[in-house]
């Protein structure tokens, strides 16, 4: 196992991750400091045989094949749901869906058995586990196996060229403080400046821009198979459901025009699946930043578009769980009654000091500058920094509560 003499902690540390393609470039900057676990079925079976011997490896295989469904289903639910959303005709077939689910559970059982035994060789202070997202197999298995070890979860950041690296979780499950008092406790988090760039998602190619009068309600749709929807959206279950909610809101708020932009990464469209509404328009060909700029409010489940809207000082209404669900920063609309009540607050704007402090904390302290294709060269130090930040934040919040 490759190790490093870490100059910050003064002890040897190994970073362990899976061979997930998205974070492959982490290997280059961590070089000899990292152990990469191969996750192919053959590789896991082979390693189990080398570690346990052929007889025990066969026993593990038999156990995985004859597993109790409830023991591993939670590790593969995201994979099955994603297939059903992306390929509804194929995976809507109960036989195909059940077969795929069983295969994934067998893989999860074998990988979990291997990882638990492999990780048991490490002392707690020798290892940092790097989990990409953690919501789907195989990363969900690593997240389960690494409980009790120091670990970080990684995901895209909220602004271009940034990453989330967090010891607690990512997106709505991350460690970003939800306490508005934290951001007003005296420290100027925005002193280092605020981000200036937002992510302009490429438009769906078959649509052209539409002319819109300013002052509309902008509703950015999200990828329904993404964890932001499947795990962190108790009310809105998919984009068809979201469209129905928007139409309902339009009926109950006759003075409002609602403008939807579908996420370009999701290739299926809601258009044509529901009757049109005269005050609900699609703007799939328009530029996201311009839609935010011209909107009077942004209604989102929990998209990063909400954070981008805060950067422009816009009113934001969230329907799902998010790390920016902070009192006086956004309005909550997690059911129809609350959504209508929030839409009625036409003059409401986020507390400007809180807004700047929150964005400054994200930009100057929380987010790591870099990307999956070009991770920071000092990635090891950035990972270690996130533990320090988490400890500091917890201490500050504890002091506020005393």
From Swiss-Prot:
Gene Ontology BP terms:
nitrogen fixation; polysaccharide biosynthetic process; polysaccharide transport
Recite the UniProt keywords alphabetically. Answer: Nitrogen fixation, Plasmid
Query: Which InterPro entries would you find in this protein's record?
Result: Capsule_polysaccharide_synth (IPR007833)
Q: Which Pfam families match?
A: Capsule_synth (PF05159)
- Name the domain of life this protein comes from: Bacteria
Q: State the protein's name.
A: Protein FixF
Q: Which organism is it from?
A: Sinorhizobium fredii (strain NBRC 101917 / NGR234)
Q: What is the lineage of its organism?
A: Bacteria, Pseudomonadati, Pseudomonadota, Alphaproteobacteria, Hyphomicrobiales
């Amino acid at each position: 196992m490759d190790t490093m003499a870490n100059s910050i902690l003064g002890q040897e540390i190994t970073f362990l991750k899976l061979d997930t393609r998205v974070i492959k470039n982490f290997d280059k900057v961590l070089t000899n400091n990292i152990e990469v676990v191969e996750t192919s079925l053959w590789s896991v079976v082979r390693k189990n045989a080398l570690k346990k011997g052929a007889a025990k490896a066969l026993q593990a295989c038999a156990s995985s094949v004859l597993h109790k469904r409830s023991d591993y289903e939670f590790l593969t639910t995201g994979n099955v749901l994603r297939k059903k959303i992306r390929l509804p005709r194929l995976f809507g077939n109960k036989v195909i869906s059940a077969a795929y689910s069983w295969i994934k559970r067998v893989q999860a059982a074998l990988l979990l058995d291997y990882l638990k035994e492999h990780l048991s060789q490490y002392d707690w202070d020798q290892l940092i586990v790097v989990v990409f997202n953690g919501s789907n197999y195989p990363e969900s298995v690593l997240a389960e196996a690494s409980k009790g070890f120091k670990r970080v979860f990684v995901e895209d950041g909220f602004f271009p060229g940034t990453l989330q690296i967090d010891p607690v979780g990512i997106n709505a499950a991350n460690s970003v403080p939800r306490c508005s008092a934290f951001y007003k406790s005296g420290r100027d988090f925005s002193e280092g400046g605020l981000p200036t760039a937002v992510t302009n998602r490429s438009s769906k190619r078959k649509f052209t821009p539409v002319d819109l009068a300013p002052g509309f309600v902008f509703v950015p749709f999200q990828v329904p198979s993404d964890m932001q929807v499947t795990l962190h959206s108790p009310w809105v279950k998919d984009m068809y459901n979201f469209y129905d909610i928007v139409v309902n809101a339009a009926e109950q708020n006759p003075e409002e025009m609602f403008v939807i932009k579908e996420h370009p990464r999701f290739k299926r469209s809601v258009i044509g699946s529901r009757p049109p509404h005269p005050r609900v328009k699609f703007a799939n060909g328009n530029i996201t930043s311009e839609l935010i700029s011209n909107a009077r409010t942004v209604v989102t489940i929990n998209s990063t578009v909400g954070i981008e809207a805060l950067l422009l000082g816009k009113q934001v209404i969230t329907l799902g769980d998010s790390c920016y669900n902070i009192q006086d920063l956004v309005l909550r609309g997690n059911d129809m009654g609350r959504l209508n009540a929030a839409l009625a607050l036409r003059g409401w704007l986020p507390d400007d000091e809180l807004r700047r402090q929150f964005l400054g904390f994200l930009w100057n302290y929380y987010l790591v500058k870099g990307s999956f294709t070009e991770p920071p060269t000092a990635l090891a130090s950035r990972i270690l920094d996130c533990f320090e930040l988490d400890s500091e934040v917890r201490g500050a919040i504890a002091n506020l509560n005393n």
